[in-house]
């Protein structure tokens, strides 16, 4: 016996969902544009493990791994925290957004995480060398 599942795709609920999605997520190309145009109302927050952050991260990002979420350093209540983790399937960033928003920080999630950032061939900063991959341009120590 074959069973067919039907979902109710209520237009009002769909609209509310997508309005929220647009308000609380951004994509890698949009974030890259914000970085390159010098938007200073953002804090880019990488919630991956410290060793993964050291191997490469979005330029200008700070690292706040899960064990530091209770007392996060570097966040700013006057700016929007753009939070990312490993991949689209990783829920660390979403969980961090819940935690940080609960502490009064404005948040957005980067869709696709660091994997999608790299797939778009956007610049990657390496902590060990203070170099940007992709542009060949050196960046100063932070």
Residue ranges of predicted features:
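Flexible, polar/low-complexity N-terminal or interdomain linker segments that lie immediately upstream
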Residues: 1-43, 50-52, 126-142
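Terminal peptide-recognition signature
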Residues: 31, 46, 61, 100
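Short active-site oxyanion
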Residues: 38-44, 59-60, 80, 106
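Short, hinge-like loop/turn segments at secondary-structure boundaries
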Residues: 62, 80, 124-128
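Glycine-rich, highly charged phosphate/nucleotide-binding loops
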Residues: 62-70
